[in-house]
């Protein structure tokens, strides 16, 4: 299935049905009076978070969504039927933004959540509504109200327990393929991964979701290399596994570049718990490995893990470190807020 994490859609709720001008006409009833019914309300436009979706690809091929109009009223005080609603089905983690792409309308993170995007127009009153003591036979009715229309942006931020970050070709996709059943594209060139991938990791009878975030480059927070869209997926991750390519010229500089981008993007990315690991250890000679570990330890301020996804060296330790970091984050989130002290 193709992946799409952003889409622009046009929505319009249904117009209300018109009220009816009608008079009661029955045998032996000389002055039947008005009996025009009200128009039906127009259909609404909703967004609903559903299970089984992980992309917005459906909205590449259909961008316009219009709810049905309400039916007109009719004689014998019969009101028109309400117009049919339209429901935009989206995956968990979808943000709905106004046309300016900044004003958040809704953030759907749980299956079953629904939000009303545009309410249908009210139906018009039939002539029976306008009967008064001085006007016993009104000959006018209201038209229905027009529906509302908007252009909206849908933006998907994948929900995962942990995220893999690093420069292009750092071995993130290989790691994901090693520890999960996911089958990402793997090749020996940068930007092999062009969209985020998800996999389920099983460790000691426990499970968590791991996201492979495409490689970040300098200027990613400003949109270089679609980096701002990739960084948006990191927002939902509770813990980060930062992979640094052991074959790079300077592992410390590579680490700092990604940390700079996380900090510049904001949204709390730089404050997330982070596990640092040097990857591709299997193809480094002992002297080079020791030098890269020293550079990375100096840049990160703590000893990094050393791993190789190809040989599984250090992989179990990395997964258990991620699990421990997630447990610590959960314990921190569960702490009650401290009472305010004047």
Curated annotation (Swiss-Prot):
PROSITE patterns: G_OBG (PS51710), GTP1_OBG (PS00905), OBG (PS51883). Residues 160-327 form the OBG-type G domain. Residues 1-159 form the Obg domain. Pfam families: GTP1_OBG, MMR_HSR1. Its cofactor is Mg(2+). Disulfide bonds: none annotated. Mg(2+) binds at residues 173, 193. GO terms for cellular component: cytoplasm. Its EC number is 3.6.5.-. It is an enzyme of class 3 (hydrolase). NCBIfam families: Obg_CgtA, PRK12297.1, PRK12299.1. PANTHER family: DEVELOPMENTALLY REGULATED GTP-BINDING PROTEIN-RELATED, MITOCHONDRIAL RIBOSOME-ASSOCIATED GTPASE 2. This is GTPase Obg. The gene is obg.
């Amino acid at each position: 299935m193709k992946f799409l994490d952003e889409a622009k859609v046009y929505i319009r709720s249904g117009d209300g049905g018109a009220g009816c001008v009608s008079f009661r006409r029955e045998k032996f009833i000389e002055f039947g009076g008005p009996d025009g019914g009200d128009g039906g309300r127009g259909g609404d436009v909703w967004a609903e978070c559903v299970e089984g979706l992980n992309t917005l690809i459906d909205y590449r091929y259909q961008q316009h969504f219009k709810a049905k109009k309400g039916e007109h009223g009719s004689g014998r005080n019969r009101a028109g039927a309400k117009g049919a609603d339209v429901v935009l089905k989206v995956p968990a983690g979808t943000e709905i933004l106004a046309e300016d792409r900044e004003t958040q309308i809704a953030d759907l993170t749980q299956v079953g959540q629904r939000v009303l995007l545009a309410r249908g127009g009210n139906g018009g009153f039939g002539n029976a509504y306008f009967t008064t003591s001085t006007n016993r036979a009104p000959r006018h009715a209201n038209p229905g109200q027009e529906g509302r229309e908007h252009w909206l942006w849908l933006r998907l931020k994948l929900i995962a327990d942990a995220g893999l970050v690093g420069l292009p070709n750092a071995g993130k996709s290989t790691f994901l393929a090693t520890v999960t059943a996911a089958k990402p594209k793997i090749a020996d060139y940068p930007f092999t991964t062009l969209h985020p991938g998800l996999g389920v990791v099983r460790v000691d009878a426990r499970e968590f979701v791991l996201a492979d975030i495409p490689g970040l480059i300098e200027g990613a927070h400003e949109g270089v290399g679609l980096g701002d869209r990739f960084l948006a997926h990191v927002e939902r991750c509770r813990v980060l596994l930062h992979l640094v390519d052991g074959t790079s010229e300077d592992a410390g500089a590579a680490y700092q570049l990604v940390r700079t981008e996380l900090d510049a993007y904001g949204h709390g990315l730089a404050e997330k718990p982070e596990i640092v690991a040097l990857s591709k250890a299997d193809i480094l000679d002992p002297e080079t490995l020791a030098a890269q570990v020293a550079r990375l330890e100096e840049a990160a301020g703590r000893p990094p893990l050393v791993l190789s996804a190809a040989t599984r060296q250090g992989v179990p330790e990395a997964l258990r470190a991620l699990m421990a970091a997630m447990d610590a984050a959960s314990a921190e989130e569960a702490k009650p807020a401290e009472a305010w002290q004047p």
